[in-house]
């Protein structure tokens, strides 16, 4: 292949290249650009908020407008900037380079993930153009307000579901890439710390995102068809919504933080000219955060009336998680201590982070104490705290990463003076914006108030100071945009390694070529700093044979599939459910998946090197299944809580056990048939393989038909909008039915690939992933039979 080939010049050629690319670097650039655009947009929203609060009794915004802008500010900053920039933006661009790989494990899935992410942003913002306007319920969309509001909540909920699907695919892809595509000789303990941070954040997100998905799905079901778990009128519990929501939304603070801690550590090591202090301890601290991060969510709920023991337990774990977080902070400080500091722009952001994050950490430990939390709950003290952690923590980390990798991403240097001016404006503006808010919290100002009276002591003066600080931040944002524009327009060309970095991305050109590396990488990795080690040992890097370089083909179908799925969610949000348009777009989405599955990923057969010996599809699906298990687990846990508390009482007339046993026979039998079909494929017996796969599909169709008939009968003989047990049955069993459809469609794709000859002895197409997913569907069904039909 011609490894120097470039897309044709011209606007349409460039646009087509972006729509069809599967190159991890281009996708990383698109993620990064979109995320920082979201940051700028959220910044504009914040200026509108602070303008409204600058003086008492201001009429710049109405209460409804203020609530809408506040909701979009929080959602845009958290979901579309902080998570995405550090994890999917820099991660997509840098992680394969750091691992010495040509691309991610699943390139087309990666492209689909980006376009779905972009669709989620558009979906959230387009609510402005529909009756009711943008959502005004806050980014937390607390029940019951979110169930009753007539604003654009449906669009917001649909956007969260689409974004969640994108995130899960992206996270599974990262973990599969890290496990499978490391350079030969690079063990897990020789990976750069940023790769470890992406791994930790991805694992945590895969496990915890189920909480947000469950909360979002259940509120959307109540809004669209009246199926409620949280409505007290039918025995539901509104606090259960908070349990679901915060089970994700506090762990996601660490998803927002971990990648940036990795970035800051990389920057500190490079500009201190010394190895990372306590590398192994930092890795263990990251994994400790992953474990403890799932045990702290309920500190957001100290004031909802839970038991004293409940509050003490979560207060303990909230304080405990400060230990691994503090370890990572001291690792960064220890790396800088005694180093030959090169005071470049990225390092300024590291130093600013250390001071501000320490302040945020101290106030976080304060809030873990239940008496103080009672005092400060929903006050501006909390607002200042989480901006300390996220704005001056993750936000500063994002700019450290942007300035650090900007020369590698763009091939251009930037004006150091402008970069430093940007930093100082942000630091001063941040401190002036949020330090007064701690005082406002002490003085009792609640968050989310759109105005206040002039006679409340201290409020007018402190709010004015905070608003002045916000405008200084805005000025810093303008300097940042100008710095980037000037660099792209006339910045000096960047050398391959402008900072003297030690990790593998600095071995590539600036910007990297399509195939990433021109040289054959050595198989010895003495430490996480291979460039330093190889230079010290005098290792000679030999050119790679172009015949050994294989890149995936571009494809239109990931973009098409994401676009049709986006259109499906628009139809769900904008129209009553069900409606004809949602079925039309769902059919178009299925068509895109068929075309995707039948398209060749590579121009000719390629033998992939994987560290684990498992295929990329196997590894990606294994980790995606973690998220699916989490989703069913949290819904089933919620159902068991309602059932054991006596709120969800089964009706006298329930679905028949004999039908469930018949379906169990069909589904369990299909697990055996798909297993033996896969076994036949491995032995090269293609006719028995195709027959076994066809039998599996038929059994799945029979299961779905029996289940549909049962649903139809029970639907017409039950008060499903008034009985909590029935609502839980339709939710969980219906969700399982959706998974049967998804799994069955995956098997159909594999069967079509088999008929086309795409599945061979060495290329199993989508079969491996589809069969694994099918076994999950079967296992979940056995649990469902036990808790709904037998019990």
UniProtKB/Swiss-Prot annotation:
Binding site for Cu cation: 250, 254, 299-300
Uppermost EC category: translocase
Membrane topology qualifier: Multi-pass membrane protein
Cross-link (1'-histidyl-3'-tyrosine (His-Tyr)): 250-254
InterPro entries noted in UniProt: Cyt_c_oxase-like_su1_dom, Cyt_c_oxase-like_su1_sf, Cyt_C_Oxase_1, Cyt_c_Oxase_su1_BS, Cyt_c_oxidase-like_su3, Cyt_c_oxidase_su1_bac, Cyt_c_oxidase_su3-like_sf, Cyt_c_oxidase_su3_a-hlx
Ligand binding (Fe(II)-heme a): 73, 387
Positions of region (COX3): 545-791
EC number assigned by the record: 7.1.1.9
Keyword vocabulary terms for this entry: Cell membrane, Copper, Electron transport, Heme, Hydrogen ion transport, Ion transport, Iron, Membrane, Metal-binding, Respiratory chain, Translocase, Transmembrane, Transmembrane helix, Transport
Span list, region COX1: 1-473
Sections of the chain in a coiled coil: none
Known role: Cytochrome c oxidase is the component of the respiratory chain that catalyzes the reduction of oxygen to water. Subunits 1-3 form the functional core of the enzyme complex. Co I is the catalytic subunit of the enzyme. Electrons originating in cytochrome c are transferred via the copper A center of subunit 2 and heme a of subunit 1 to the bimetallic center formed by heme a3 and copper B. This cytochrome c oxidase shows proton pump activity across the membrane in addition to the electron transfer.
Protein family membership: In the N-terminal section; belongs to the heme-copper respiratory oxidase family. In the C-terminal section; belongs to the cytochrome c oxidase subunit 3 family.
NCBIfam families registered for this protein in UniProt: CtaD_CoxA (TIGR02891)
Entries under PANTHER family matching the protein: CYTOCHROME C OXIDASE SUBUNIT 1
Descriptive protein name: Cytochrome c oxidase polypeptide I+III
Organism this protein belongs to: Thermus thermophilus (strain ATCC 27634 / DSM 579 / HB8)
